[in-house]
Amino acid sequence: MASTISAYKEKMKELSVLSLICSCFYSQPHPNTVYQYGDMEVKQLDKRASGQSFEVILKSPSDLSPESPMLSSPPKRKDTSLEELQKRLEAAEERRKTQEAQVLKQLAERREHEREVLHKALEENNNFSRLAEEKLNYKMELSKEIREAHLAALRERLREKELHAAEVRRNKEQREEMSG
């Protein structure tokens, strides 16, 4: 029992309180574990619904040799002169102007395209209106001609009936004169 308590105290010293609490609630190992196989490291990344993903890190040949020195510090940047700074500023200004000109050109092209689309839409609308008006006029003319033809046919029948009635009256008068 005493050895268990001393081992527990050693463990408490090694782990932070947060790790201890997490290990109590979550007993499985951390998902981002690193496995080493010879000259490469395999790091497990997030698990996805489509499967698992891994990151493979290969050690460089310089890391493999034991006598190789540690990575050297990066080379120090030399002080830039005022002329170099001026050149960089001018180049940046030129890039900014070029980018601004390109944006303005794209805006102009977009406006021109919008004008063309609007003009085409107006033209199509005018053509549609003109065709609809022509079609309506044609239908009105056709109905007017049909109406006039119908009225002419009615007048012709009425005239024929009047002629027939006049002939019947004449025949009747002739019969009356002959009979009486």
Curated annotation (Swiss-Prot):
Residues 58-82 are annotated as: Disordered. Residues 76-179 form a coiled coil. One of its GO terms (molecular function) is tubulin binding. Residues 38-180 form the SLD domain. Residues 60-74 have a biased composition (Low complexity). The modification Phosphoserine is found at residues 50, 60, 65, 68, 72-73, 81. Its main location: Golgi. N-terminal palmitoylation promotes specific anchoring to the cytosolic leaflet of Golgi membranes and subsequent vesicular trafficking along dendrites and axons. Neuronal Stathmins are substrates for palmitoyltransferases ZDHHC3, ZDHHC7 and ZDHHC15. InterPro entries: Stathmin_CS, Stathmin_fam, Stathmin_sf. One of its GO terms (cellular component) is Golgi apparatus. PROSITE patterns: STATHMIN_1, STATHMIN_2, STATHMIN_3. The keyword Lipoprotein applies. GO terms for biological process: microtubule depolymerization; neuron projection development; regulation of microtubule polymerization or depolymerization. It is found in: Golgi apparatus; Cell projection, Growth cone; Cell projection, Axon; Cytoplasm, Cytosol. Keywords: Cell projection, Coiled coil, Cytoplasm, Golgi apparatus, Lipoprotein, Palmitate, Phosphoprotein. Pfam families: Stathmin. It comes from the Eukaryota. A lipid is attached at residues 22, 24 (S-palmitoyl cysteine). Belongs to the stathmin family. Exhibits microtubule-destabilizing activity, which is antagonized by STAT3. PANTHER family: STATHMIN, STATHMIN-3. Interacts with STAT3. Interacts with CLU (secreted form); this interaction may act as an important modulator during neuronal differentiation. This is Stathmin-3.
